[in-house]
Every structure is written in structure tokens, then in C-alpha cells.
């Protein structure tokens, strides 16, 4: 590159030949390349620039970077700006990052950590002596060469660029390594290069424990914890495994007060890094990467072994005998038509939310804020979430000794035992709001923990828009008695108006490749058989659309594991095993599959594209290899596509909800003696823990649902329904309030009713299924009635499960199903067949039904889906 240019405009491919892609991230892709003139290898980061991103400041960083030449710093070769892509050329480090390495090898040894820490400190000492900060020390940014040399990467120009790019998607991932003074910069008034020394201590823990402290917590909550005055620096968890010297080194690096924290020069004199440490330690580590010993490191729990009985990896659908007659129900399935399923306001609208929350409109105002630093983005996020005002107040927050490093505080005094607790009413509601009836269940003596994340400010009201229509002209305005409208409908309409003509042309018409949709008619769907003779004992079902192929898959959770069925290949129908452990619950969020799996009934998070790729790889293995025993045993962490969510063992029930007021999505799990609440973090594409509430669960736990209420950050958790006691109150919701900082004690003096289903259709509309009756009530448990909506629907059978359609409720019982109109309580559809036993397997996106013969309930089952609606998924 011509040294006269700070940012070359020539074609970089004239100087470098791209060999292979070696990494990718939210910023772009990293390639291994070769200089065509010298033959020298290089690492090239290719970043696609978005409109409005200003990189004028980067040129100044490039000039500064030219002077940075040190054995422990990745050499900078130059940068190219070509069309809308920025190419950053750096020294190639063939050993990879320490994060990549420990994902394969497991924890580093103490001497290896000492060697890496010493080399890192030497690089920081050089940077600090030149008046520079790294600002992003962590395992992912410490690289090894093929010869075992340690190099610091992603600082200077890369740090500035990454900080700018990261505001789009990944700005939230860094707080785990962030020093307290950086987290509280607005109150503390700035920070200096000593923040890098804090990150060295956190990285040492990361290399020893495979993740930084608080990594299982929501990033914003971890950031908030660090700003508290009683925050205690983290320590190594295992006191006996590591030497006193290592413990003391971590303690010195993690000195909370930056004025007392040692400099890089001072820390280089610590006995932990002055002991004899040679490059052979890193070479041994690289050898372990290239020849991993899977017997010494694996990512599984001994209490969750492989299935004892080998089950088929591939299950073909059996062919029906030509002379075999269809059952009476199957004949009716082809004749009875159903209207589309109702999209609830509290249902996480995955694809829509992804574009709305992180689309261009949002980026231009927030993520693409010029050349602001990563820190500034985090500050803005704190402002947006209402945390800043709370940063100045260190009192009144309960302790979270299990997850954080705060000193224990005395919990606040318990309030007097209330008879019932009022729910804030919408100002537009015409209901009497004097008597609140959502009731908090008795909780344990300890307060709900933790509530360190302060409540977000109430969101602004949505502008008036056309109410969303529910079925035959029953709008949400009519259903609610208030002008709330359907958030899903409003957002989709708004999204549609914002699309340019070009974008509309580019959008493919078919949402998925599967069963063909029917024309847009009032009732155009029917149940279609998709599998004949299924031997699995299925507990649940959902569906997913592959973003690359657009093929639609059914995903089943069964005793035998997680299986999938491609609806685009029904001509050669077969189920494929995705995961070998028992599964009792499934939910898909974007490309992430959540499940309750394994012997210990623990929550898992699976990467769906990775899970499908891995299943295909297993099919190519020799038949002699027991593939069902492979996943957790031999798969390195780096490539693991299934991960257990910590602290979620013995999960009985789960539910997912979206808060229509804020757009945030929550996953709640009922454990044996507690409740866990997790929030979806879009940049990280996973649910992360925000609350762990000790609570004695009812036994048996018949129902477990979340209810979103106005002006509350987190949804209430409904664990039961009892008879109403107040005037006009037909039901009373027994709830646990995650927003409370103390325990609420209320005595349940009325027995629970036999409730089979509770679902929140809209903000103040809840459907409660009791025995043979369905009641539509508000948050206070009072019936909602109008000229266009029946408040009660009655059936002549014991309801086992329901699906809400746009005009009706479809109730399932042992030998069939019946639909009744929301308006008139009249029967809209009915299928009955005493020769078959029916069971609803799932209704998220796709309604999936199972059928077995009555005279042989253990026989193989037939599977059906409600198909035919345009845009159904």
C-alpha cells in the first residue's frame, strides 16, 4: 500500500488474494489472505458500511496506528475504502483467539493463563506509554500466532470502527469486561487507561472458567450492578484449584477504585507473571487445539446421560394401503373449513419485531449515531431504559448474592397483608377500577430476587391508527371497549407503508416452501395429514422456516428426542432426529429453538441452522457409529449448537410473552421451588436471566402463564385461578409479581378452579377455559361483554385444549373438536369421531393435531396440520 494514503481507494484485490473466510461477526467477515507481491499472509476484515456512517475520525486513528509496532500487538498493514466496503489489513495470527481456543480445549492451565497475562500486560504497557487505550481486552481479542506469540487485536482503528459498527447489533455484549468507572462514566466523570487493567483481571477469570463473571445475566443488568456502591469485584470461584498468587493477581487487577488499581508496569512486577514462563506453554495449548483430548473435556453433565435405548435417527411415514378406507374424521377433515388463527397482542411477533426494533429507522436514530463510541451507545441505552436516574441512588435495591457480587443487604420490611392488589387501569377503560383483583400468591420469606434492574419509564402511547380487525368485523376496539388496537396489525401496516417500491419487488411472495396456501377467502383452511404411523411419544410441536431455503419444518418434542419434518418434501415424508434427549416443551424465536430437555428437564437453547447442519453431518457417518450418543461427547464448545440455560433444572412448565407496551419479550419457567424470568436480547439472539424468584409452586401446577399489565416492566406470572369474591368478579388470578422488591403475602381462602387454559388475547382481554365453559374477562376477572362479543362460550364436553381463531374458539376434546363463534356462541365447526383419540400438540404458528385409534391408544399415530391460509406459518 502506498504509505502516502491513509485510506487507499484502489482495489484491495490487486494487492491481496483472499484464501478463505476464517471468521464472521456483526461487523462483517474476516478473511485469510496473501499479499500477491510478498507472499506474506494477512488477516483482512471486510466491513460493509451503511448509509450515514461517518468514518472521518478513522483516518486519524489510522495515522496513529502506523506508529504502533510491538511484539505483542497485531501489526497494522493498511486500509482500503472500496465502494461501500472498508477493508482493514492486519497481521495474520494462525493460532486463533483465546476464546476460540478454550472453546475446544476447555479451561487454560494456571501457567498458561500467567503467560498470556504477562504478554497482554506487556502490550498494554507499550500502548499506555504512547498515550493509547485498548478499551476492549477480552479473550476474543487476544490472539496466538502459530509459534505461540501473544498479540493484542482490535484496538486503535479496529476499536473505533468496531465501536461504530457495533452500535447496530452488538453494542450490548461488552459490559462483562467493562470496568466499574466505565459503566458509571456519567456519574464518575471519565476514565483512563487503567480500565484495561480491570479487563485483564476479568479475562484471567474468563480463561479459567470459560466465561467472564455475570455472563449468564442480562448485559444491561450486569452493567447496572457494576454501578452500585456496594458492588464487590468478582473472584475466581474455585478457591482450592488455583494458587494464592493467582487469586492475588486477580484481586489486584480487579481493584474497584481506579486510583488504587496498579498500572500495567506495576502489575508486570507481580509474582504471578514474574515466574518462569516460556512460549512453550502457548505451543502446548496450540497442540491441544490441533489434537483435542475429548476424554478430558466435554460439554455435558454426568447427570444427563445419553438415551439408554437407541431410537431411529430417521423415521419414514408408512404408506397407507390402497384398499384401506379413510376414517370418518379424515373425511370430515377435508370438508370442514376453518378461519385463520388469531394473532394475539402478547404473542412474540418474531420477524416483524426484528425489523421494527433493529431496522433502518431505528438504526438511523440510535445505532448509527455518527462516530460515537461503544460506551456512548451503552450510556444511551441506559438513558432509554430509565436506568440513569437510578444510578445515583444506591439504596432500596435488594440483594442478588447468587448472581452478582453485591454485598448482602437487609431486605425491605414486608408490607401489610393486602386482601387484593389493584392493577392500574387504562384511562380509556369504561370498567370500574376501584377493586383490583389480580392477586399475588404467597411467596417465600425471601424477597423476589433480584430487582436491580430498575423499571423502564412507561412507553409513549401509540398514535391513533385503524383498529385491527378480528374476524367478522370484531375489531380490538370493540373487543376491548377501548382504542388499543392490535399492535401486530398496526406494526405490519406501518412496516408496509415504509417499504419502497424496489423493496416490495424484492420481497418474495411465498413466505415458505411447504403446503400451498389457499386463496384469501373467509374460511379456507382444513386439516391435512402430513405423517402416517408415527411411533414417537410426542409431547409438543412447533414450526420453523429455514431462512436460506424457505422450507417450512415441523419440529416435534418427544420422549425419544427432538425430531423435524420438512413440509416441502411430503412426497418422501420422513422425520429426522435433531437432538437425542427427551423433550417436553418447544418454542422458536427467530432461528433459536428453546426446549425443556433431558433427564433433568432443563431449559436448552439450540441454534436451529446449526442443529440442522449437524443432523446432516450425522447422516453421513458410518452406520456402525452410534450417532445418537455423539452430540455432547465429541462436539467442541466452539461448534456446539445446543447449550443448557444455567439454573433452570427441573423445569415443570414454560411460557413466552411479548409486552405490547414496550416490545420486550420474556420467557418464564416454573422450577420446583422457584420461578426464573428471562428476557430476549436481540443483539445476542438469546434469552438471558433477569429474575430468579423463590416461590413454592402449587402441586399439581395446572397452569402457568404470564399476564402483561399496564405500567409494569415485567409481566405477572399467573400460577392459578380461583373463584371471584368481589362484585361482578367471575375469576380471580393468582399471580406472582416479579416487579416487587419484597414478598407479598395474601391468603388464598377460595379453592382453585379446574382451569385448563388461560391466554391474554389483548391488553385487557383474557380468555379463561373452565371445564366445559370459556369465559372472556378483563384483568380484574370481570366478564367482558358487548353487542359483538359473547362473554361466555359453552361446550357440551370437557375441554382439553383450545386454539383461538379469528372468529371463533376451537375447543378440542378426546374424540374431536368444536368451534364456537366469538359473537354468538353458535357452533361454527364440528368434527367428532369416537373411533379416534385426538390430542393438540401445538398451535404456535401451525396447529398440529395427533390422532390414534380408540381401541388401541398405544398404536402409532397420524399427524395433521391446519393448512391452507395465505401467509400461515
From Swiss-Prot:
Top EC group: transferase
UniProt GO cellular component terms: cytoplasm
Domain Protein kinase: 16-273
SMART domains, alphabetized: CNH, S_TKc
Keywords: Acetylation, ATP-binding, Kinase, Nucleotide-binding, Phosphoprotein, Serine/threonine-protein kinase, Transferase
Residues the record marks as active site: 136
Catalysed reactions listed for this entry: L-seryl-[protein] + ATP = O-phospho-L-seryl-[protein] + ADP + H(+); L-threonyl-[protein] + ATP = O-phospho-L-threonyl-[protein] + ADP + H(+)
Listed GO biological process terms: intracellular signal transduction; protein phosphorylation; response to tumor necrosis factor; response to UV
Modified residues (Phosphoserine): 329, 377
Domain CNH: 535-846
Family the entry assigns: Belongs to the protein kinase superfamily. STE Ser/Thr protein kinase family. STE20 subfamily.
Protein's UniProt name: Mitogen-activated protein kinase kinase kinase kinase 3
Organism: Rattus norvegicus
Lineage: Eukaryota, Metazoa, Chordata, Craniata, Vertebrata
Gene designation per UniProt: Map4k3
Amino acid at each position: 500500500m502506498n504509505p502516502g494514503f491513509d485510506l487507499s481507494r484502489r482495489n484491495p484485490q490487486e494487492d491481496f488474494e483472499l484464501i478463505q473466510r476464517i471468521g464472521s461477526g456483526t461487523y462483517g467477515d474476516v478473511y485469510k489472505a496473501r499479499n500477491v507481491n510478498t507472499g506474506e499472509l494477512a488477516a483482512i476484515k471486510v466491513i460493509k458500511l451503511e448509509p450515514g456512517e461517518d468514518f472521518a475520525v478513522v483516518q486519524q486513528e489510522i495515522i496513529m496506528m502506523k506508529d504502533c509496532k510491538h511484539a505483542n500487538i497485531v501489526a497494522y498493514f493498511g486500509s482500503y475504502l472500496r465502494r461501500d466496503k472498508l477493508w482493514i489489513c492486519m497481521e495474520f495470527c494462525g493460532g486463533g483467539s483465546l476464546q476460540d481456543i478454550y472453546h475446544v480445549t476447555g479451561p487454560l492451565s494456571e501457567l498458561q493463563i500467567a503467560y498470556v497475562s504477562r504478554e497482554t500486560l506487556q502490550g498494554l504497557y507499550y500502548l499506555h506509554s504512547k498515550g493509547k487505550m485498548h478499551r476492549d481486552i477480552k479473550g476474543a481479542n487476544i490472539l496466538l500466532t502459530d509459534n505461540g506469540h501473544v498479540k493484542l487485536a482490535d484496538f486503535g482503528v479496529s476499536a473505533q470502527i468496531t465501536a461504530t459498527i457495533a452500535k447496530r447489533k452488538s453494542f450490548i455484549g461488552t459490559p462483562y469486561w467493562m470496568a466499574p468507572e466505565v459503566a458509571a462514566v456519567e456519574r464518575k466523570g471519565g476514565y483512563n487507561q487503567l480500565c484495561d487493567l480491570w479487563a485483564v483481571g476479568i479475562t484471567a477469570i474468563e480463561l479459567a472458567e470459560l466465561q467472564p463473571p455475570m455472563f449468564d445475566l442480562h448485559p444491561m443488568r450486569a452493567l447496572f450492578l457494576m454501578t452500585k456502591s456496594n458492588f464487590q469485584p468478582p473472584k475466581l470461584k474455585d478457591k482450592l484449584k488455583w494458587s494464592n498468587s493467582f487469586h492475588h493477581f486477580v484481586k489486584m487487577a480487579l481493584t474497584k477504585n481506579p486510583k488504587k488499581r496498579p498500572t500495567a508496569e506495576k502489575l508486570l512486577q507481580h509474582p504471578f507473571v514474574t515466574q518462569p514462563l516460556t512460549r512453550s506453554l502457548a505451543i502446548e495449548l496450540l497442540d491441544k487445539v490441533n489434537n483435542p483430548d475429548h476424554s478430558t473435556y466435554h460439554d455435558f453433565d454426568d447427570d444427563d446421560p445419553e438415551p439408554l435405548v437407541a431410537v431411529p435417527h430417521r423415521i419414514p411415514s408408512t404408506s397407507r394401503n390402497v384398499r384401506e378406507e379413510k376414517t370418518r374424521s379424515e373425511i370430515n377433515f377435508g370438508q370442514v373449513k376453518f378461519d385463520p388463527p388469531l394473532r394475539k397482542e402478547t404473542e412474540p411477533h418474531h420477524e416483524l419485531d426484528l425489523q421494527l426494533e433493529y431496522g433502518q429507522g431505528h438504526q438511523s436514530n440510535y445505532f448509527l449515531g455518527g462516530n460515537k463510541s461503544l460506551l456512548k451507545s451503552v450510556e444511551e441505552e441506559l438513558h432509554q431504559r430509565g436506568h440513569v436516574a437510578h444510578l445515583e441512588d444506591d439504596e432500596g435495591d435488594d440483594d442478588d448474592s447468587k448472581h452478582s457480587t453485591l454485598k448482602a443487604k437487609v431486605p425491605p420490611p414486608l408490607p401489610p397483608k393486602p386482601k387484593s392488589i389493584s392493577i392500574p387501569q387504562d384511562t380509556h377503560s369504561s370498567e370500574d377500577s376501584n377493586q383490583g383483583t389480580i392477586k399475588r400468591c404467597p411467596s417465600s420469606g425471601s424477597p423476589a430476587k433480584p430487582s436491580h434492574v430498575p423499571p423502564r419509564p412507561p412507553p409513549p402511547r401509540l398514535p391513533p391508527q385503524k383498529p385491527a380487525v378480528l374476524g367478522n368485523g370484531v375489531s380490538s376496539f370493540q373487543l376491548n371497549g377501548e382504542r388499543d388496537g392490535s399492535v401486530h396489525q398496526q406494526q405490519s401496516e406501518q412496516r408496509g407503508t415504509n417499504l419502497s417500491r424496489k423493496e416490495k419487488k424484492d420481497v418474495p411472495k411465498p413466505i415458505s416452501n411447504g403446503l400451498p396456501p389457499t386463496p384469501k377467502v373467509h374460511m379456507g383452511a382444513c386439516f391435512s395429514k402430513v405423517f402416517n404411523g408415527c411411533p414417537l411419544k410426542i409431547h409438543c410441536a412447533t414450526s420453523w422456516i429455514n431462512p436460506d431455503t424457505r422450507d417450512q419444518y415441523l419440529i416435534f418434542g418427544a420422549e425419544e428426542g427432538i425430531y423435524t419434518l420438512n413440509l416441502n418434501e411430503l412426497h418422501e415424508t420422513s422425520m429426522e432426529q435433531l437432538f437425542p434427549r427427551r423433550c417436553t416443551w418447544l418454542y422458536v424465536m427467530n432461528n433459536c429453538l428453546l426446549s425443556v430437555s433431558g433427564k433433568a428437564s432443563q431449559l436448552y437453547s439450540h441454534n436451529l441452522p446449526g442443529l440442522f447442519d449437524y443432523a446432516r453431518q450425522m447422516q453421513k457417518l458410518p452406520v456402525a457409529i452410534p450417532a445418537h450418543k455423539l452430540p455432547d461427547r465429541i462436539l467442541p464448545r466452539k461448534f456446539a449448537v445446543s447449550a443448557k440455560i444455567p439454573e433452570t433444572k427441573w423445569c415443570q412448565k414454560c411460557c413466552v410473552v411479548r409486552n405490547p407496551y414496550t416490545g420486550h419479550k420474556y420467557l418464564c419457567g416454573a422450577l420446583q421451588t422457584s420461578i426464573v424470568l428471562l428476557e430476549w436480547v436481540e443483539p445476542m439472539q438469546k434469552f438471558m436471566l433477569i429474575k430468579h424468584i423463590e416461590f413454592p409452586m402449587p402441586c399439581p401446577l395446572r397452569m402457568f402463564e404470564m399476564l402483561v399489565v399496564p405500567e409494569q416492566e415485567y409481566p405477572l406470572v399467573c400460577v392459578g385461578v380461583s373463584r371471584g369474591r368481589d362484585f361482578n368478579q367471575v375469576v380471580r388470578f393468582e399471580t406472582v409479581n416479579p416487579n416487587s422488591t419484597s414478598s407479598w403475602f395474601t391468603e388464598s381462602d377460595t379453592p382453585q378452579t379446574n382451569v385448563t387454559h388461560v391466554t391474554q388475547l389483548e391488553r385487557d382481554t383474557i380468555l379463561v377455559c373452565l371445564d366445559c365453559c370459556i369465559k372472556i374477562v378483563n384483568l380484574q376477572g370481570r366478564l367482558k361483554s358487548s353487542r359483538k362479543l359473547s362473554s361466555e362460550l359453552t361446550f357440551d364436553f370437557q375441554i382439553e385444549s383450545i386454539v383461538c381463531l379469528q372468529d371463533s374458539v376451537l375447543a378440542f376434546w378426546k374424540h374431536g373438536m368444536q368451534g364456537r363463534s366469538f359473537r354468538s356462541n353458535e357452533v361454527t365447526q364440528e368434527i367428532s369421531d369416537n373411533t379416534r383419540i385426538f390430542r393438540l400438540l401445538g398451535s404456535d404458528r401451525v396447529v398440529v393435531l395427533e390422532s390414534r385409534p380408540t381401541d388401541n391408544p398405544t398404536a402409532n399415530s397420524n399427524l395433521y396440520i391446519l393448512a391452507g391460509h395465505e401467509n400461515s406459518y
